[in-house]
């Protein structure tokens, strides 16, 4: 294998990678050894030294070693195994909700155990829930890690340990194979080489300052951030050039349907909505495809803007497709559009992954014949077997869940008779202007900066978890005395959907016991779509008082009677995501409240962030504050808003680099076209395909 380029070495050549693991790795776009080396850690854990159990502080992640004192299984309410260990300085209780007989047998009294996890304050002193542990052999000194331990973004069925072992093999290959240096010499001078940077980031020595890594300031990160931002900018330059070569159906003014809808509405559009609709209509009258991003705060009325844009296309006898990220949100859109469009004689179709057999077939036939003019659904609407009949406009709701390459794939799927559909992309995640210019440089941007009248601002309070019982009483009062409904949102910092679902289930059990007089529902990401739909429908119809949920309810769910939201561990989420969640209440005329139920002690930055939410309901103000206050160790921004197009760069954190990166990208685009193409291929392979279209 000596001398080969690592972008040509498949992962199947690594020890332990068979067909099943290859398929799982492909789900996170890992196909070659180069892909794996560019799959960088989300964060790091310091497992290089031991903490005395007696000195553990709540909230600290630590490695401890101790002798097993006892290990017991209890069956009260929920099966649980507890194991107590001691190192002489104190006693730690390890708590497991998922365990096997083999685990119980391995933790025999007298055995020595090395454990890593988050220390918490329990009923009987220090405890860790589901720590990682290893039973020690006869060695007098524990086997500690020699480098900081990386935590990678992963997918179901791929463990951290697997990714770490595979990455070790990939790093060894750097000695015998090559990874191409693509930066022109005048740029890379004085910088770390690519192999050096990759070794440092995958296996940082314990002497390296964690704060440097957490703030993205380490030279190894700067080397890769520069390359990734350049690739992103180069891809935007290529896409802009490519888009101008496409043709779209020009849709001139035809306002009969629009005027009918406006006359039937019980309210008048805001000035901001009217301005944005005018910008969209100007674009749609041209013979090149519109590519416009509409930003609007939670509840600003983006759906009406989308409806008015859709009517322009339908008035010309064309079809419109609206794609939402979840079936939950797509179904809600379908209902809204039916209420508005059916009185105008417009048929609204609905396509989602859960549809099977005859229902799906008849819906596909209605779309292919042109009987259905407005099609609403999830990504299922762009599957191979769906044939459109004159598709002229594609609306994508919640852009941050669809990557650049996904929105470009819609061009390909929607193309008919040489015409490409116009594209309208809507997001409720406000982005400060400088960042929007970079993240969406291939799009024109409109902003709905005005809320409709009659919305009640949500009152937000931050309360420590020690007052949990008071909050449960507050939920009881809201649901029974006031006749309202409430959300209880569980958050988890882990990248595992399974652990998040388990946390939500545990909270659901707890609240059912504490509130026997309430009907309590549960919704999380691992439930089947049909189960989620059924629970949400029950909540919307008022059959459930309280909904325990993970962050799956972040987007678009609309239940006007819900006036109270509890968010557990809000310190784990970014401001934008907290603001999105809070937007699920305050959708009716009644006063609404959001309780941020935090664990103590709070970091200084977390305190400031929660204060921002208490002080403001304006998403654009909150986005700007997010830029100003994000402190060390809090990797928010692109990863947490779901913009997975960036592996190492963070548009919020790295914004100071953006003007220079834009200048350098133009230089490379003009002077080094081959390197430009290779950079896009390395960092954004899907986009590269479309920029050649």
Curated annotation (Swiss-Prot):
Which parts of the sequence belong to the Helicase ATP-binding domain?
283-448
Residues in Helicase C-terminal domain copies: 482-628
Q: Which SUPFAM superfamilies match?
A: Nucleic acid-binding proteins, P-loop containing nucleoside triphosphate hydrolases
Keywords per UniProt: ATP-binding, DNA damage, DNA recombination, DNA repair, DNA-binding, Helicase, Hydrolase, Isomerase, Nucleotide-binding
Q: Where does ATP bind?
A: 296-303
Q: Where is the motif (DEAH box)?
A: 397-400
State the top-level EC class: isomerase
PROSITE patterns per the UniProt record, alphabetical: HELICASE_ATP_BIND_1, HELICASE_CTER
Q: Which Pfam families match?
A: DEAD, Helicase_C, RecG_dom3_C, RecG_wedge
Q: Provide the catalytic activity annotation.
A: Couples ATP hydrolysis with the unwinding of duplex DNA by translocating in the 3'-5' direction; ATP + H2O = ADP + phosphate + H(+)
| Region described as Wedge domain: spans on this chain | 48-146
Q: What is known of its domains?
A: The wedge domain within the N-terminus inserts into the replication fork junction, where the lagging and leading strand split.
Record function comment: Plays a critical role in recombination and DNA repair. Helps process Holliday junction intermediates to mature products by catalyzing branch migration. Has replication fork regression activity, unwinds stalled or blocked replication forks to make a HJ that can be resolved. Has a DNA unwinding activity characteristic of a DNA helicase with 3'-5' polarity.
Please give the name of this protein: ATP-dependent DNA helicase RecG
């Amino acid at each position: 294998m000596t001398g080969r380029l690592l972008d040509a070495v498949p992962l199947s050549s690594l020890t332990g990678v068979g067909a099943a693991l290859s398929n799982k790795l492909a789900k996170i776009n890992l196909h070659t050894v180069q892909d794996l080396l560019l799959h960088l850690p989300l964060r790091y854990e310091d497992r290089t030294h031991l903490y005395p159990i007696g000195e553990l502080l709540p909230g600290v992640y630590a490695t401890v070693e101790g002798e097993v004192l006892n290990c017991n299984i209890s069956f009260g309410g929920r099966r649980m195994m507890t194991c107590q260990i001691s190192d002489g300085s104190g006693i730690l209780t390890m708590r497991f909700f998922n365990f096997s007989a083999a685990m119980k047998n391995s933790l025999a009294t007298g055995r020595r155990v090395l454990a890593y996890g988050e220390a918490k304050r329990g009923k009987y002193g220090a405890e860790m829930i589901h720590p990682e542990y290893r039973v020690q052999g006869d060695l007098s000194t524990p086997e500690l890690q020699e480098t900081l331990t990386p935590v990678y973004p992963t997918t179901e069925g791929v463990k951290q340990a697997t990714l770490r072992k595979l990455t070790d093999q990939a790093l060894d290959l750097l000695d015998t194979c090559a990874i191409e240096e693509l930066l022109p010499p005048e740029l890379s001078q004085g910088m770390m080489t690519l192999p050096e940077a990759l070794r440092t980031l995958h296996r940082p020595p314990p002497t390296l300052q964690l704060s440097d890594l957490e703030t993205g300031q380490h030279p190894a990160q700067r080397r890769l951030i520069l390359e990734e931002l350049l690739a992103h900018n180069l891809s935007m330059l290529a896409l802009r050039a490519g888009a101008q070569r496409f043709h779209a159906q020009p849709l001139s003014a035809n306002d009969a349907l629009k005027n009918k809808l406006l006359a039937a509405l019980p309210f008048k559009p805001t000035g901001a909505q009217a301005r944005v609709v005018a910008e969209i209509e100007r674009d749609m009258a041209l013979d090149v495809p519109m590519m416009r991003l509409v930003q609007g705060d939670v509840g600003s009325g983006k759906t009406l803007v989308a409806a008015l844009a859709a009517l322009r296309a339908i008035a010309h006898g064309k079809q419109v497709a609206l794609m939402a990220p979840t079936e939950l949100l797509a179904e809600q859109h379908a209902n809204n559009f039916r209420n508005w469009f059916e009185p105008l004689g417009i048929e609204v179709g609905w396509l989602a992954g859960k549809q099977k057999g005859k229902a799906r077939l008849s819906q596909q036939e209605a779309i292919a014949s042109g009987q259905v003019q407005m099609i609403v659904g999830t990504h299922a609407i762009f599957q191979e077997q769906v044939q459109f009949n004159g598709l002229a406009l594609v609306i994508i709701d919640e852009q941050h869940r669809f990557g650049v390459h996904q929105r470009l794939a819609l061009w390909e799927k929607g193309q008919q008779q040489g015409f490409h559909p116009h594209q309208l992309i809507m997001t409720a995640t406000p982005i400060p202007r400088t960042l929007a210019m970079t993240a969406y440089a291939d799009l024109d941007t409109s902003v709905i900066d005005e809320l409709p009248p009659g919305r009640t601002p949500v009152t937000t309070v931050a309360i420590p978890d020690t007052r949990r019982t008071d909050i449960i009483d507050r939920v009881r009062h809201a649901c029974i005395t006031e006749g309202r409904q409430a959300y209880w949102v569980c958050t988890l910092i882990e990248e595992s959907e399974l652990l998040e679902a388990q946390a939500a289930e545990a909270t659901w059990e707890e609240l059912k016991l504490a509130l026997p007089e309430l009907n309590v529902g549960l919704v999380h990401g691992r439930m089947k779509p049909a189960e989620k739909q059924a629970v949400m429908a029950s909540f919307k119809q008022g059959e459930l008082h309280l909904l325990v949920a993970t962050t799956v309810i972040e987007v678009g769910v609309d239940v006007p009677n819900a006036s109270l939201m509890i968010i557990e561990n809000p310190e784990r989420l970014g401001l934008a995501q907290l603001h999105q969640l809070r937007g699920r209440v305050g959708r009716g005329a009644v006063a609404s409240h959001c309780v941020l139920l935090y664990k103590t002690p709070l970091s200084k930055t977390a305190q400031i962030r929660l204060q921002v939410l208490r002080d403001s309901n304006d998403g654009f103000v909150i986005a700007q504050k997010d830029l100003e206050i994000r402190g060390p160790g809090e990797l928010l921004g692109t990863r947490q808003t779901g913009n997975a197009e960036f592996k190492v760069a963070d548009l919020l954190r790295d914004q100071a680099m953006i003007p220079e990166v834009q200048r350098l990208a133009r230089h490379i685009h003009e002077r080094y076209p081959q390197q430009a193409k290779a950079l896009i291929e390395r960092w954004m392979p899907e986009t590269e395909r479309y920029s050649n279209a």
